[in-house]
């Protein structure tokens, strides 16, 4: 059955799904890599610093970052990479937050129980408006027994923290969504999570158009760039222009952070998150996706669809299963006339 499925689908795959290629400025550089590698090939150009503790199946991301740092890799900001491996995932979340507070473009990598362990720190990262990216190799959280393979327990256990969340279906999306999530995070001042399925994407080698270093530089810019403040609420805080990654901890201009708020002030600060920050994310994300599509030809939407315009049946999902679901949709249309 599987052989018949592939023989039927492969010649037709993409006939209805892919637009004709067009000339774009940054089509990418073709390579054969897994999802973990695709992430690091982007992050080592974009980011300044990583705080991470290794955990399967995202271990390779931290390892590859550490290798790049050890080799003296210089990113688009002309900085050598910084890597700190503390004693746990909980500490890694604090380290990454601290890096972001000092104005560095920061990143973390984790999975499964590691995400659950750092859970409490993620709320504070949102409340402090720290625009870092957490890369997640999505893994089942231990219940009746240990399982290191794919599951979305960790991805959904942080739904209530306020992080921006995006999920890649393959290694190509893991690379592209890192850049899109990063730009959205830095414009909205809200941290972002980029998920990919453990082993099914993190360790599966496939053909990927790796984003060029020049694309990363043009699309993201440097963390110390002065940009036009993108929202009215941010203008109240920073004025008409601000640093792309704000510096909250600065030894030259020290300030206090994380103070105690009693009921009235805490209520106002918490309620104000939505109108002043969260409500702007949708528009900012759509703008970042549109700009990325113009530069690369690879277009993204907040909710992606496949052959849905005239469909009678819809399969709803996320992650690596989408690749198979798209192939099944092609097969059923071709062989069963089912839409």
Where are these regions (language model features)?
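Conformationally flexible catalytic loops at phosphate/diphosphate-handling active centers
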Residues: 77-81, 192-304
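Flexible, glycine/charged-enriched surface loops at secondary-structure junctions
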Residues: 15-19, 23, 189-195, 295-306, ...
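Short helix/loop capping segments that flank catalytic or ligand/cofactor-binding pockets
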Residues: 118, 144, 203-205, 324-326
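Conserved thiamine diphosphate
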Residues: 148-198, 202, 210, 219-229
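Generic long, charged, amphipathic alpha-helical segments
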Residues: 325-339
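Glycine-/acidic-rich phosphate or pyrophosphate-binding loops and their flanking alpha/beta elements
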Residues: 34-39, 290-313, 326, 330
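Glycine-rich beta-alpha junction loops
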Residues: 139-140, 197-203, 319-321
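Thiamine diphosphate
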Residues: 1-157, 162, 179
